[in-house]
From Swiss-Prot:
Active site: 158, 228 (proton donor), 324
Entry EC number(s): 1.3.1.98
Protein name, as recorded: UDP-N-acetylenolpyruvoylglucosamine reductase
Entry's Gene Ontology BP terms: cell division; cell wall organization; peptidoglycan biosynthetic process; regulation of cell shape
Gene: murB
Catalyzed reaction equations: UDP-N-acetyl-alpha-D-muramate + NADP(+) = UDP-N-acetyl-3-O-(1-carboxyvinyl)-alpha-D-glucosamine + NADPH + H(+)
PANTHER family found in the cross-reference section: UDP-N-ACETYLENOLPYRUVOYLGLUCOSAMINE REDUCTASE
Organism: Haemophilus influenzae (strain ATCC 51907 / DSM 11121 / KW20 / Rd)
Function noted in UniProt: Cell wall formation.
NCBIfam families tied to this protein: murB, PRK00046.1, PRK13903.1
C-alpha cells in the first residue's frame, strides 16, 4: 500500500494500493486499462482538495497531471484551453498577469482546473459556469474524447453532470474558458461591495479575495481541511420567513426561483459549535463551515463530527446540511449525505 496523506488536503492517514501520476492521455488510458484487467477500483484525483477518505482505498489512485494552457482571442473574447492538471489558483494568477480578466473572484480556490466543473466551483458572486466555454472529457471505455458545452454540463449550485452520468469511466482532460475583453467587475459579496466599480481593477479584486480567504480559511498545508465542508442550504421562502421570525439578522440570498439560500457557516456558528471537537476532528474556530484535522483525525472522526453538526443545526433551524466534500470508501465514492445521516 502507498500513503495517500500527501495527496489530499485533509491529510488524513490513509493508503491506496497504488498511486500513479498521469502526464499524458495515453498514460491515463494505460493505467485505466491495467486497473480494469486486474478488476481494481480506480479514483482520479487532482489535488485532493475536496475529498475525505473514510478508509484505505483498495485500488489505484490516478493523479491528473495533464499540464498546459493555450490562449486565443478574437475582437470580443479571450479563449483559454486549460489542461486538467493545472493548478486553479495559478491559472487565475497567470490570467491576471497576462491582462485576461474575469477569474479574479475565484482566486485561491484549491484544486485543479479539471476538478472545477465537477463542483461548479464558485465564490464571491462568480461560478465556473459563468466563464466556461466547454469541458473536454475522455471516455475511458472507448478512448474517445468529446466536448460538452456549458448547457450540456448541467451546472447547478455545487452540481454538474460530472457527479452523475459522467462520474464513472470518464475523466476531464481539459476545460475551455471564455472571458470578455469588455471586463465588468463583480462586486456583490463581502468587502468587495466597498470598491468603486468605475475605478476598481481586476488585480485589486484578486488581492482582496486572497486576503479574505487567507484571513478566515486555514491553510491546508498547516491544518488539514477540505475548505467548505457543507453546501449553503437552499430553503423555501416560507421556511426562510419562519426562521427569520426568531433570527432577525439571518444572512440570506434570494434565488431566481423564489427560494432562499442561507449561509451554512452562520447556522453552525449560531449553534455555538466553533471549536467543537470529536476525536482528532474539530470545527474551525474562525470559520464554522470548515471542519479540520486538528490532531491525527481519522475519516470516521470527521464523519462523526459532520453528523453532530448536521443534527444540531437541524434541531435548531429545521435545516439539514449537505456535505460539499466527496466521501471516498475502500471501493470508491459513496453518498456523503447518507453517511452522515
Amino acid at each position: 500500500m502507498q500513503n495517500l496523506q500527501p495527496f489530499h488536503t485533509f491529510h488524513i492517514q490513509s493508503n491506496a494500493r497504488e498511486i500513479i501520476e498521469a502526464h499524458s492521455i495515453e498514460q491515463l488510458q494505460q493505467v485505466w486499462a491495467n486497473s480494469k484487467s486486474e478488476n481494481l477500483p480506480t479514483l482520479f484525483l487532482g489535488q485532493g482538495s475536496n475529498v475525505l477518505f473514510l478508509d484505505d482505498f483498495n485500488g489505484i489512485v490516478i493523479l491528473n497531471r495533464l499540464m498546459g494552457i493555450t490562449h486565443e482571442q478574437d475582437a470580443n473574447f479571450h479563449y483559454l484551453h486549460v489542461n486538467g492538471g493545472e493548478n486553479w489558483h495559478k491559472l487565475v494568477e497567470w490570467s491576471i498577469n497576462n491582462g485576461i480578466y474575469g477569474l479574479e473572484n475565484l482566486a485561491l480556490i484549491p484544486g485543479c482546473a479539471g476538478s472545477a466543473p465537477i463542483q461548479n466551483i464558485g465564490a464571491y458572486g462568480v461560478e465556473f459556469k459563468d466563464v466556461c466555454d466547454y469541458v473536454e472529457v475522455l471516455n475511458l471505455n472507448t478512448n474517445e474524447t468529446f466536448r460538452l458545452d456549458t448547457e450540456q454540463c448541467e451546472f447547478g449550485y455545487r452540481e454538474s453532470i460530472f457527479k452523475h452520468r459522467y462520474q464513472q469511466g470518464y475523466v476531464i482532460t481539459a476545460v475551455g474558458l471564455k472571458l470578455k475583453k469588455d471586463w465588468q467587475p463583480i462586486l456583490k459579496y463581502g468587502s468587495l461591495v466597498e470598491f468603486d466599480p468605475k475605478t476598481v481593477t481586476a488585480k485589486q479584486i484578486f488581492d482582496e479575495v486572497c486576503h479574505i480567504r487567507q484571513s478566515k480559511l486555514p491553510d491546508p498545508n498547516e491544518v488539514g481541511n477540505a475548505g467548505s465542508f457543507f453546501k449553503n442550504p437552499v430553503v423555501s421562502s416560507e421556511h426562510f420567513e419562519e426562521i427569520k421570525k426568531h433570527h432577525e439578522n439571518l444572512p440570506h440570498f434570494p434565488q431566481a426561483d423564489g427560494s432562499v439560500k442561507l449561509a451554512a457557516g452562520w447556522l453552525i456558528d449560531q449553534c455555538n459549535l466553533k471549536g467543537f471537537q470529536i476525536g482528532g476532528a474539530a470545527v474551525h474556530k474562525k470559520q464554522a463551515l470548515v471542519l479540520i484535522n486538528k490532531n491525527g483525525a481519522t475519516g470516521q472522526d470527521v464523519v462523526k463530527l459532520a453528523h453532530h453538526v448536521r443534527q444540531t443545526v437541524a434541531e435548531k433551524f429545521g435545516v439539514y446540511l449537505q456535505p460539499e466534500v466527496r466521501f471516498i470508501s475502500a471501493t470508491g465514492e459513496v453518498n456523503s449525505e447518507q453517511i452522515i445521516t
